[in-house]
């Protein structure tokens, strides 16, 4: 008996060549709808699905393969005598190959003008049913859902006259990954349409972007996956123009740098090391912004990651070229800038859209045995809700410095303290177990520049000791959430030293 293949694909990539190869191996091909028309238009002889089922395609193609003659042929265990007898009695012939990919649901809902009806119509029913049946019976059926696998299958058929068992198992595993991802997209779309924020089960799907050489350390394996609908303003959707392959740590640091630089509408440059900012500068142009980011911490920037929210021009590229950097990420690079920077063969150059994230974005954090899901912290300073509990209000320049420090501090590991002055950070205290410890680090880093600077704290001061350290350093303005039971103690210290203090009412912990 001739072997038979059922071919019905929405992604027509390579299908004509593949079916031609199947026919050359003496395999009969059954097909449906648009796939059948394409194959016949290319001179290939195929059998219509209705000839197998004895039933026409109905309901605009919604029902065409949901038939015992199809699923019996897929699910029958060929060495089971009872199955064989039933097939013979009912006139069911085995199907040995299934070549199916599914209706383009993801592409449909990605369209800005998609309607709910369009989305529903692109939920495939027959396709998933067929490939799941075939994958369950993979001992006897080869099921191909990805055009990438066409060549492998044809090569084994030509060499061995059949598809190897190991390949069948791999193809079956891919089917269930494929259908799981497909169903996850559908369930997530419908969940969002209903406005459900915390469903009883959460199913997420990601697509492999690349294998990484190793993870955070050389002994750890790692892979980079991207979300199917991630914001284009992300490292996952960045275009690499030059340099070595991105590492696990590169991706983390680039993500952190990009998150910070999105906070600014004016020209801004951010330097990051180990996911914490070491220098942030703003200016009238990107060259001035970079100069300030560099001067913020010329030691730590070495080997760092740079993110800019404007095109990198030649003058800025020449300054960047002077030091060792891992990555530069920007909306674009001028032709002259690329010529300068590409002389460093390992320097990674990435382009990406710079758009501030919205609260609709979700942040997923894995913990042992579970997953934490929260909204991204995209909240900006709302001047209509702040309060100034001190006798003195910030000056115009102090306000400018406070706003810069506040934008940055929410991206620093808690406990976090940031000092800013004259359109740049001058000290960053990150990740200490007590707040005053972070303040001391930031003040020490700033040195004499701390005099007349502004300080931002990601959370309230539990005690006035941080205020006292700030006063000793000559800091003149502070922004913090407030809300401590000892706020009055901090206010008294601030008033004693003439420090202007702003309460935002918003905390920005980052762990």
UniProtKB/Swiss-Prot annotation:
Name of the protein: Bifunctional purine biosynthesis protein PurH
InterPro entries: AICAR_Tfase_dup_dom_sf, Cytidine_deaminase-like, MGS-like_dom, MGS-like_dom_sf, PurH-like
Domain notes: The IMP cyclohydrolase activity resides in the N-terminal region.
GO molecular function ontology, one term from the record: phosphoribosylaminoimidazolecarboxamide formyltransferase activity
Superkingdom to which the source organism belongs: Bacteria
Reactions mediated catalytically: (6R)-10-formyltetrahydrofolate + 5-amino-1-(5-phospho-beta-D-ribosyl)imidazole-4-carboxamide = 5-formamido-1-(5-phospho-D-ribosyl)imidazole-4-carboxamide + (6S)-5,6,7,8-tetrahydrofolate; IMP + H2O = 5-formamido-1-(5-phospho-D-ribosyl)imidazole-4-carboxamide
Tagged with keyword Hydrolase: yes
The protein's annotated pathway: Purine metabolism; IMP biosynthesis via de novo pathway; 5-formamido-1-(5-phospho-D-ribosyl)imidazole-4-carboxamide from 5-amino-1-(5-phospho-D-ribosyl)imidazole-4-carboxamide (10-formyl THF route): step 1/1; Purine metabolism; IMP biosynthesis via de novo pathway; IMP from 5-formamido-1-(5-phospho-D-ribosyl)imidazole-4-carboxamide: step 1/1
EC number: 2.1.2.3, 3.5.4.10
GO cellular component, one term: cytosol
Lineage, highest ranks first: Bacteria, Bacillati, Bacillota, Bacilli, Bacillales
Listed PROSITE patterns: MGS
Keywords attached to this entry: Hydrolase, Multifunctional enzyme, Purine biosynthesis, Transferase
GO biological process, one term: 'de novo' IMP biosynthetic process
Gene3D superfamilies, per database record: 3.40.140.20, Methylglyoxal synthase-like domain
Hydrolase as UniProt keyword: yes
Domain MGS-like: 1-145
Record family assignment: Belongs to the PurH family.
HAMAP family: PurH
């Amino acid at each position: 008996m001739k072997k038979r293949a059922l071919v019905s694909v929405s992604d027509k990539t390579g299908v004509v060549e593949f079916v031609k190869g199947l026919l050359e191996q003496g395999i009969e091909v059954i097909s449906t709808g648009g796939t059948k028309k394409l194959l016949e238009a290319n001179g290939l002889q195929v059998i219509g699905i209705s000839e197998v089922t004895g039933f026409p395609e109905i309901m605009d193609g919604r029902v065409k393969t949901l038939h015992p003659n199809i699923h019996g042929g897929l699910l029958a265990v060929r060495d089971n005598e009872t199955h064989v007898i039933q097939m013979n009695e009912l006139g069911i012939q085995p199907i040995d190959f299934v070549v199916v990919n599914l209706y383009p649901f993801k592409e449909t809902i990605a369209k800005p003008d998609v309607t709910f009806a369009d989305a529903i119509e692109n939920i495939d029913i027959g396709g998933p049913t067929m490939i799941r049946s075939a994958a369950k019976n993979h001992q006897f059926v080869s099921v191909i859902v990805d055009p990438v696998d066409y060549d492998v299958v044809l090569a084994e058929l030509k060499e061995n006259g059949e598809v190897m068992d190991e390949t069948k198992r791999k193809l079956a595993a891919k089917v269930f990954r494929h259908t799981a991802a497909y169903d996850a997209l559908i369930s997530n779309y419908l969940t969002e349409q209903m406005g459900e924020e915390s469903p009883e089960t959460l199913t997420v799907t990601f697509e492999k972007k690349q294998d990484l050489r190793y993870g955070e350390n050389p002994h750890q394996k790692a892979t980079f996956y991207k979300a199917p609908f991630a914001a284009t303003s992300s490292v996952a959707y960045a275009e690499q123009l030059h340099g070595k392959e991105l590492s696990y740590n590169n991706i983390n640091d680039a993500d952190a740098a990009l998150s910070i630089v999105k906070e600014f509408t004016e020209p801004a440059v951010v330097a990051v090391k180990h996911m914490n900012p070491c220098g942030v500068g703003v200016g009238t142009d990107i060259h001035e912004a970079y100069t300030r980011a560099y001067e913020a911490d010329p030691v730590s920037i070495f080997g760092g990651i740079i993110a800019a929210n404007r095109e990198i021009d030649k003058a800025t590229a020449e300054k960047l070229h002077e030091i060792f950097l891992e990555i530069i990420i920007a909306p674009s690079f001028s032709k002259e800038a690329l010529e300068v920077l590409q002389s460093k063969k390992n320097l990674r150059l990435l382009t990406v859209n710079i758009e501030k994230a919205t609260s609709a974005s979700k942040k997923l954090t894995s913990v042992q045995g579970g997953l934490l899901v929260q909204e991204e912290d995209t909240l900006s300073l709302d001047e209509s809700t702040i309060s100034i509990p001190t006798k003195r209000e910030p000056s115009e320049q102090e306000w400018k410095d406070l706003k810069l420090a506040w934008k940055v501090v929410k991206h620093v590991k808690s406990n976090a303290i940031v000092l800013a002055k004259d359109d740049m950070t001058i000290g960053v205290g990150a990740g200490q177990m007590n707040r005053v410890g972070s303040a001391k680090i930031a003040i020490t880093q700033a040195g004499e520049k701390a005099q007349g600077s502004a300080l931002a704290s990601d959370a309230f001061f539990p005690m006035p000791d941080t205020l006292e350290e700030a006063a000793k350093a000559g800091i003149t303005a502070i922004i913090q959430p407030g809300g401590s039971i000892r706020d009055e103690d901090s206010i008294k210290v601030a008033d004693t030293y003439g420090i202007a203090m702003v309460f935002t009412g918003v905390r920005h912990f980052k762990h």
